[in-house]
Amino acid sequence: MKRSQLGFTLIEIIFVIFIIGMAVSVISIAVGGNAAADMTRKEAEEFMLQASYISEQSVLKGETQGLFVELRPAQDIDAEEQWCYQWRRVRDRQWQDLPELSPHCLPEGLVIEFVVDDELWEFDPELEYQDPVMGFFPSGDGSGKVEVSIYTDQLKGGQTSVTEELELDLAGELHWLSEEKRIEEDKRGR
């Protein structure tokens, strides 16, 4: 007399779980995001939020406010140099740190670059006093045309470089050019 099989064998269950696991891993690799692109976009968003806040505060408080940028040296042997920026305001004829915004450093491997009035701005560590890279005035105007690029350092990451571009125009308006382009492409794609 033969017994009828009422369930699955252990081998069959293990095989099905293996197939499902393989399918999930293939899908996650195919759909998985670009970490460098996500990090670059997050930093551009942070910069945009801070600059918009500073622009508004400059008008509301009647203060001139500026952006100071520096390349900080590596802190230990395994670390890399880091780009950091800090917003300051003019009080008593000198630049003072803003208490509401602490200095912000980009993650290692990211670079921030400025083109001020069509000239590439370069950080000079030898200077005792650095001028602000860009600023906002109480009138609502900006300090001039400034193009800001945040991107991955291709030499260190071995990854595809993703650049986020922002621009401050003469009227003090800040535009996230990369985001505007993405939105326009999404509209055309529909």
Where do the language-model regions lie?
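N-terminal single-pass transmembrane signal-anchor helix
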Residues: 1-31
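Short, hydrophobic-rich beta-strand element in sensory/regulatory alpha-beta domains
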Residues: 64-69
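N-terminal helix-rich module
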Residues: 14, 26-49, 53-56, 60, ...
